[in-house]
């Protein structure tokens, strides 16, 4: 029986969560490993860190802990239809200065196109924004347990749908194994700049992103 337990994330976890994600998410996520002309473009912006902090007070984010040590993280928050259009417009209008800007622009586009609200006929959803697991305990079902706990939390809080956008094949495989439906998949190669150059040159097999969801 695993000693790893799952509990609600608190604002007191914030600093440790950010340190954890720096190692176990941003240095592992295939999209973040795409080489950039300037290595500084791969750094995580303060705006991204502030987004993480802003989600915690919603009491929808979780941590997996082994004793006192965080070994897994889910950042999640409520999503409403207006968010899709607002985030898309913000991403379209924002000057791209780093790799995360490029990623956010692509993902905002696919989420707007998938439109899980229209797909399911609902007005709110629990959005699983980020899933990270300690690299030393991969394949011990910690990620699966975190997603299962997020789905159960969504059910308890009265959300009609839980959704996420999988940026790599590992997360897509994990979530579809939990009966999450794949609403839309788009290849990164379809995202090109004004010169026709591919913006996100992702490596196999992580060459597409997928919006997944489950009705509760």
From Swiss-Prot:
Domain of life: Eukaryota
Keywords annotated in UniProt: Acyltransferase, Transferase
Catalytic activity: a 2-arylethylamine + acetyl-CoA = an N-acetyl-2-arylethylamine + CoA + H(+); serotonin + acetyl-CoA = N-acetylserotonin + CoA + H(+); serotonin + butanoyl-CoA = N-butanoylserotonin + CoA + H(+); serotonin + hexadecanoyl-CoA = N-hexadecanoyl-serotonin + CoA + H(+)
Enzyme Commission number: 2.3.1.87, 2.3.2.-
Phenotype when the gene is knocked out: RNAi-mediated knockdown results in decreased levels of N-palmitoyldopamine (PALDA) and N-oleoylethanolamine and higher levels of N-palmitoyl-derived fatty acid amides (FAAs), N-palmitoylglycine, palmitamide and palmitoleamide.
Enzyme class: transferase
Stated name of the protein: Arylalkylamine N-acetyltransferase-like 2
Name of the encoding gene: AANATL2
Pathway(s) where this gene product acts: Aromatic compound metabolism; melatonin biosynthesis; melatonin from serotonin: step 1/2; Lipid metabolism; fatty acid metabolism
A single GO molecular function term of this UniProt record: N-acetyltransferase activity
Gene Ontology terms describing biological process: fatty acid metabolic process; melatonin biosynthetic process
Impact noted for substituting residue 30 to A: Reduces catalytic activity
InterPro entries named in the record: Acyl_CoA_acyltransferase, GNAT_dom
Residue(s) at site: Regulates catalysis and binding of the amine substrate: 30
Organism: Drosophila melanogaster
Role played: Catalyzes the formation of long-chain N-acylserotonins and N-acyldopamines, which are important cellular signaling lipids. Catalyzes in vitro the formation of various N-acetyl-2-arylethylamines such as N-acetyltryptamine and melatonin.
pH dependence: Optimum pH is 8-8.5.
Family: Belongs to the acetyltransferase family. AANAT subfamily.
UniProt site positions, description: Regulates amine substrate binding: 29
């Amino acid at each position: 029986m695993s000693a790893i337990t799952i509990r609600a994330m608190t604002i007191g976890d914030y600093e440790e969560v950010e340190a954890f994600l720096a190692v176990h998410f941003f240095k592992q996520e295939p999209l973040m490993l795409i080489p950039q002309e300037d290595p500084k473009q791969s750094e995580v912006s303060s705006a991204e860190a502030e987004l993480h902090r802003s989600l915690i007070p919603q009491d929808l984010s979780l941590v997996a802990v082994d004793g006192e040590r965080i070994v897994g993280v889910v950042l999640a928050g409520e999503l409403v239809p207006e968010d899709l259009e607002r985030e898309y417009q913000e991403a379209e209008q924002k000057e791209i200065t780093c790799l995360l800007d490029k990623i956010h622009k692509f993902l905002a586009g696919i989420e707007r196109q998938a439109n899980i609200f229209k797909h399911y006929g609902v007005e709110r959803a629990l959005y699983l924004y980020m899933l990270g697991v300690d690299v030393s305990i991969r394949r011990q079902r910690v990620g699966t347990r975190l997603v299962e706990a997020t789905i159960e939390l969504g059910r308890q809080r009265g959300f009609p749908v839980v959704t996420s956008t999988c940026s790599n094949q590992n997360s897509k495989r994990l979530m579809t194994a939990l009966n999450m439906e794949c609403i839309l998949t788009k290849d990164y190669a379809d995202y090109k700049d004004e010169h026709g150059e591919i913006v996100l040159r992702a490596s196999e097999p992580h060459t597409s992103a997928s919006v997944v969801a489950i009705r509760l």
